[in-house]
């Protein structure tokens, strides 16, 4: 690595530590020529995730778009923005773990719903109504029934 002060191409690493939540490493360096100390950050370059929409068009994965949808679904609910950012981070982490570069939008929606169900059931129903585009009240009731079953299963697991 070149020294930013004297442009010498030799530095030694004095300290190296991970940076939380950013997947990067902070390194404290010292120039072997002039002794100048500086900090660098090293991070893995992520390949972009491509979301394939229902109509076949492709868009790059956008955390902000998911977060905006979650904020709308959680209006007037006791849910912090930090909780919603955690949902988005978990969804993105799961998507990246699949090692696929193109992911159907339906898969993204299912992941968001699964994460949201554990945060707030009302927000889950609101998000599901937009994501699943309920055509009539029967589909809405079916979704509510599935959510109630999942809730009861979770309660039973917590009691054992």
Curated annotation (Swiss-Prot):
Keyword set includes Repressor: yes
Any Pfam family matching the protein: Zn_ribbon_NrdR
GO MF: ATP binding; DNA binding; zinc ion binding
PROSITE patterns: ATP_CONE
Zinc finger (unnamed): 3-34
Location of the ATP-cone domain: 49-139
Keywords from the UniProt entry: ATP-binding, DNA-binding, Metal-binding, Nucleotide-binding, Repressor, Transcription, Transcription regulation, Zinc, Zinc-finger
Cofactor annotation: Zn(2+)
Alphabetical GO biological process terms: negative regulation of DNA-templated transcription
Cofactor note as given: Binds 1 zinc ion.
Family of this protein: Belongs to the NrdR family.
Function: Negatively regulates transcription of bacterial ribonucleotide reductase nrd genes and operons by binding to NrdR-boxes.
Protein name per the record: Transcriptional repressor NrdR
Gene: nrdR
């Amino acid at each position: 690595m070149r020294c930013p002060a004297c442009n010498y191409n030799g530095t030694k690493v004095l300290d190296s530590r991970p940076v939380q939540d950013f997947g990067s490493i902070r390194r404290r360096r010292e120039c072997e020529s002039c002794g100048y100390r500086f900090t660098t950050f090293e991070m893995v370059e992520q390949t972009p995730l491509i979301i394939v929409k229902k109509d076949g068009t492709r868009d790059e994965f956008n955390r902000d778009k998911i977060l905006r949808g979650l904020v709308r679904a959680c209006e007037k609910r006791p849910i912090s923005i930090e909780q919603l950012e955690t949902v988005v981070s978990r969804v993105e982490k799961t998507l990246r773990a699949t090692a696929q570069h193109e992911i159907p939008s339906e898969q993204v929606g299912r992941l968001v719903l699964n994460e949201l169900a554990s945060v707030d059931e009302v927000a889950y129903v609101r998000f599901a109504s937009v994501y699943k585009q309920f055509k009539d009240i029967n589909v809405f009731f079916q979704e509510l029934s599935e959510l109630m079953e999942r809730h009861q299963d979770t309660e039973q697991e917590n009691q054992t």
